[in-house]
A protein has these predicted regions:
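N-terminal organellar transit peptides
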Residues: 1-20, 24-140
Length: 140
C-alpha cells in the first residue's frame, strides 16, 4: 500500500462511486469546470422477497457508511451530509467545483489558464499542426 500523501484530481465528473473513491485522498483538487455528485446508493434488485429484503438491508448499511464517511471528510454534520446525499430532487446534489469546495468536499479549485498544470507538457501530447488538421477534417 502507498504510505505517502495522496492527491486526487477531479478532471470532469466525480459522481457516484467516483465521488466516494476520491474521499480516500489526503488532498482533493478539482478543475473549475469539474462537477461533484454524491448521492445515496443505487441498485437494481431481482429475486424473491428475501432477496429484496437482503438487498435493502445492505443498501441501508452502505448509506449509513456514506453518511459517516462524507461527514468525516468534510467536517459537516451527518444531517448536512444527508441533505447533500438526498439533494433537491432526491438524486443527490450536483456541485460545481466551487460549490464542492464551499461544502468541504474539495480542498482546492484549479483555475483553467489554457496551460497544463505547472506549465508541464502532457505525456502523449498532440502537436498544434495535428490539432489543426483534425479541426479542419471535423468541420468540413
Amino acid at each position: 500500500a502507498h504510505t505517502g500523501p495522496t492527491t486526487g484530481i477531479i478532471e470532469g465528473l466525480a459522481g457516484s462511486a467516483a465521488s466516494l473513491a476520491v474521499m480516500a485522498c489526503d488532498t482533493i483538487k478539482a478543475y473549475a469546470t469539474s462537477k461533484f455528485h454524491p448521492h445515496y446508493s443505487l441498485c437494481i434488485a431481482m429475486g424473491h422477497k428475501a432477496d429484496i429484503a437482503d438487498t435493502l438491508l445492505m443498501m441501508e448499511k452502505l448509506d449509513a457508511d456514506l453518511e459517516q464517511l462524507y461527514a468525516t471528510r468534510t467536517g459537516n454534520s451527518v444531517e448536512v451530509t444527508k441533505s447533500h446525499l438526498i439533494g433537491p430532487h432526491g438524486d443527490g446534489t450536483h456541485f460545481t467545483a466551487a460549490e464542492a469546495k464551499a461544502a468541504g468536499y474539495v480542498d482546492e479549485v484549479i483555475q483553467i489558464t489554457g496551460k497544463t498544470p505547472q506549465g508541464s507538457k502532457p505525456k502523449n501530447s498532440v502537436s498544434a499542426d495535428r490539432l489543426r488538421m483534425w479541426k479542419r477534417a471535423l468541420t468540413r
